A protein has these predicted regions:
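Acidic/polar-rich alpha-helix caps and helix-coil junctions
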Residues: 1-192, 221-228, 233-489
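Acidic-aromatic pocket-rim loops
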Residues: 186-213, 377
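Segments forming glycine/polar-rich beta-alpha architectures that bind adenosine-containing cofactors
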Residues: 208-222, 241
Length: 489
């Protein structure tokens, strides 16, 4: 590359781009396996010593990733020409990835006593160092003034979801999208996102009641404080007066498509809890077939995440202040129609949600906000891993409250019942969730003939801490016996 006829700045920029992608590659490997072989140069096909070496320490790999990201942050250019679409690599993309990575690594080291890929204690306590690196990256990006939250107060009931369904998000949301996948019909770069969201083979996505309970009321107070028996609040009532993002993330009463001409109720036949996602789902139902080519751009890193990364790192460092809150959590909540209230005590529901292991009021509120704002953006799994909350994956699923079995329900608010929960093997015009004897997976109601949907109770799910990293594939160890297996696998 250095032989190219270009200025030193341009050469450094493209080396930064290359090192950005190398860092991204190794971040994925680190988060999957922990310790992996690290290579800083290309390998000759005859160099068997390099090809068949063992795993480098997780801490070495982590440090090398940070080196690459620091180089990219320093040398990738921030010229406007690299930012005229949100799909190019530039300085701020590198800063955003550095912030995301350093938050992961800092909290991973804080909450995990041992390196999961060795089962042994970390050789050095570097959690604070990584959290401070996250703060520095966020501050540089935030202070640049290049990015902001997309917020039109008149459109707050729809604008959140529109970011994920816009035909030209890379252009329309350049102020918030730091990096995105730029789909294009003319170039044949498309995907069938609608089909994944509504097709009977794919559309089994569903949120749990435990998570939906974390959405605040519009007045900024917890839903779980307003209702003492919060799990028994009927569906229409629990969707009323909530954070605007709720109705832009799941099907709630009044949800329509096709320009408002068709009502779409939660389909319990497929989305078993009743909390069926709509984020990413386009308005035009004629595009729901698996052959439909859709080109809505998909954000990979948004400015909202940078604010959340900053808030979380500051909270974890014990440095959350009202000034930090007002720059991060407050604007996110106000954009969602929620009054911002600076916390004075920990919400008992959030303490319980995170297994009574976290009691810091700021950490808990940042986690609440992160879950709501970044839902379905591919970050939650790694969040649960780094927080050492793997037991959440084995927590029983809880769905919407059903007042009575065999009684047709109107879940979309058009006054016409369309949903039925029954233990009878029957064919009906309704969308049906079969329970008890009619349900092979063991779907039930929590109180027998009424109560919360309890999907797939016959499915046994257990958590073991060795699952914080994935197993090294057996075929890889067969090919290279110098590779060790992760503990427990």
């Amino acid at each position: 590359m250095r032989k190219a006829s270009a200025s030193e700045a341009i050469l450094n920029h493209y080396e930064g781009v290359g090192r950005f992608f190398r860092a991204m590659f190794y971040i994925s490997k680190l988060q999957t396996f922990g310790a992996v072989p690290f290579y800083s140069t290309s390998i000759d096909a005859t160099d068997t010593e390099a090809l068949y070496k063992g795993r480098d320490s997780r801490e070495l790999v982590a440090a090398k990733i940070l080196e690459d990201l620091n180089y990219a942050c320093k040398h990738c250019l921030d010229d406007a020409k690299y930012r005229n679409r949100a799909s190019y690599i530039h300085k701020y993309v590198a800063l955003a990835l550095k912030a995301r990575y350093c938050l992961f690594e800092g909290t991973m080291r804080k909450y995990h006593t041992n390196d999961p890929s060795t089962g042994k204690a970390w050789t050095a306590d570097e959690s604070e160092m990584y959290l401070k690196e996250c703060v520095a990256a966020c501050e540089e990006l935030m202070n640049s003034g290049v990015y902001s939250l997309a917020d039109n107060p008149a459109g707050r009931k729809t604008q959140y979801r529109e970011m994920f369904t816009h035909d030209d998000g890379c252009g329309a949301y350049m102020n918030e999208f730091i990096w995105a996948r730029d789909y294009d019909i003319a170039m044949g770069v498309t995907y069938a996102i609608n089909n994944y969201m509504v097709n009977s083979q794919h559309a089994n996505y569903a949120f749990t009641r435990q998570f939906i309970n974390t959405y605040l009321m519009e007045d900024g107070t917890p839903f779980t404080t307003k209702y003492s028996d919060y799990n028994s609040v009927p569906f229409a009532e629990e969707c009323t007066g909530r954070d605007y993002r709720l109705a832009q993330t799941i099907r709630t009463p009044g949800f329509t498509r096709d320009g408002g001409t068709t009502f779409w109720a939660p389909d319990v036949t497929y989305s078993k809890t009743g909390y069926q996602p709509i984020k990413w789902l386009g308005d035009n139902s004629s595009m729901d077939a698996n052959t439909s080519a859709i080109a809505t751009d998909a954000p990979i890193m948004r400015y909202a995440e940078v604010l959340l990364n900053y808030a979380e790192a500051k909270a974890e460092l014990g440095q959350m202040t009202e000034e930090v809150w007002n720059k991060t959590i407050k604007p996110l909540r106000e954009r969602a129609g929620v009054k911002s209230i600076y916390p004075t005590e920990a919400d008992p529901y959030m303490v319980e949600y995170f297994q009574n292991r976290v009691t810091d009021k700021f950490v808990l509120e940042v986690r609440r906000e992160r879950g709501v704002e970044l839902a379905m953006e591919g970050l939650r799994y790694n969040d649960v891993i780094r927080w050492k909350q793997g037991e959440l994956f084995a927590r029983p699923w809880i769905g919407i409250y059903i007042p009575s079995v065999d009684t047709p329900l109107d879940l979309n608010g058009d006054t016409v019942p369309e949903t039925l929960v029954t233990a009878k093997s029957t064919v009906s015009k309704y969308k049906i969730l079969y329970i008890d004897g009619a349900s092979e997976p063991g779907h039930k109601l929590s109180e027998g003939t009424k109560g919360n949907i309890l999907p797939a109770t016959s499915l046994e799910r257990k958590w073991h801490d060795y699952k914080y990293v994935k197993p090294v594939p057996a075929i890889a160890i067969t090919e290279n016996p110098n590779l060790s297996q992760n503990p427990g696998w």
